Design a protein with these regions (language model features):
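N-terminal cysteine/histidine-rich coordination modules
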Residues: 1-83
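Short, well-ordered helical secondary-structure segments
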Residues: 4-7, 17, 37, 103-106, ...
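Generic ordered-secondary-structure signal
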Residues: 12, 21, 28-34, 74, ...
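Generic alpha-helix detector with strongest preference for long hydrophobic helices that associate
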Residues: 31, 38, 96-100, 173, ...
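Short flanking/linker segments adjacent to small metal-binding domains or redox-active Cys/His motifs
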Residues: 89-129
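C-terminal, charged low-complexity interaction regions
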Residues: 117-217
Length: 217
């Protein structure tokens, strides 16, 4: 039977999920199955997790705990896309000053921004440095995160997926425009492509050329 090593937990982080910062419900084994240890780049671990993070990803065959964390972040982003879209469609001030009427809208005004901030915090949370047997766990990572609207996505591709769903973009058009403008102009690409939500293969090329002409390219 394999030995799993407990990570050291700083006093300020006791009872905290290492993956998202919420209160932890349990300590999970990583990887889940002994035979998956063969692909690990570090010792097998036990680590505190909340209920959602411990169950949101079905597989645990990853080369490191950091890649497993990335998978959890991606799953949380997908599951809570509607909550995260609040921060993309509103600012806190806009919500407070909006003239939405009715009990349902009043409830939305009160709860929407705190819900977004809570989920934003969970997605952005990086956990504390992992120490096992007095040794800092150092593993090379090829992760290339991307930040948009205050949320740190695991990758540019995840940010694109979120933007397409949130702003009802034509994905083929958006990714093509983004490739021309570059990821540093992610917001501009969204603004340009929001004008053309429903495209067909026959008119997508014309729209793309129209966008390029509008920005002088």
């Amino acid at each position: 039977m394999a030995t799993f090593y407990a990570v050291e937990i700083p006093f300020n982080y006791r009872s905290t999920c290492w993956f998202c910062g919420e209160p932890s419900d349990k300590k999970i084994k990583f990887p889940q199955y002994d035979y998956e240890i063969n692909i690990l780049d570090h010792l097998p671990l036990t680590i505190p997790s909340c209920k959602e993070c411990s169950s949101i990803v079905n597989r645990s065959a990853f080369t490191s705990i950091y890649h497993y964390r990335d998978a959890i972040k991606k799953a949380l982003t997908k599951k809570h896309q509607k909550v995260l879209s609040i921060g993309s469609n509103w600012t806190k001030k806009e919500l407070e000053e909006s003239e939405l009427e009715g009990s349902a809208f009043e409830g939305f005004k009160r709860s929407a921004w705190p819900m977004f901030e809570m989920m934003q915090g969970r997605i952005n949370y990086q956990g504390w440095p992992l120490v096992v047997n007095n040794q800092l766990l150092v593993v090379d990572s090829d992760n290339d995160s991307f930040e948009f609207d205050g949320v740190i996505y695991v990758s540019l591709d995840d940010a694109v997926t979120h933007a397409v769903k949130t702003f009802f973009l034509d994905e083929a058009l958006f990714t093509r425009v983004l490739s021309v403008l570059g990821k540093n102009k992610f917001s501009q690409a969204i603004r340009l492509c929001r004008l053309y939500p429903n495209l067909t293969a026959s008119n997508r090329e014309d729209v793309f050329l129209e966008i390029l002409d509008s920005i002088g390219l």
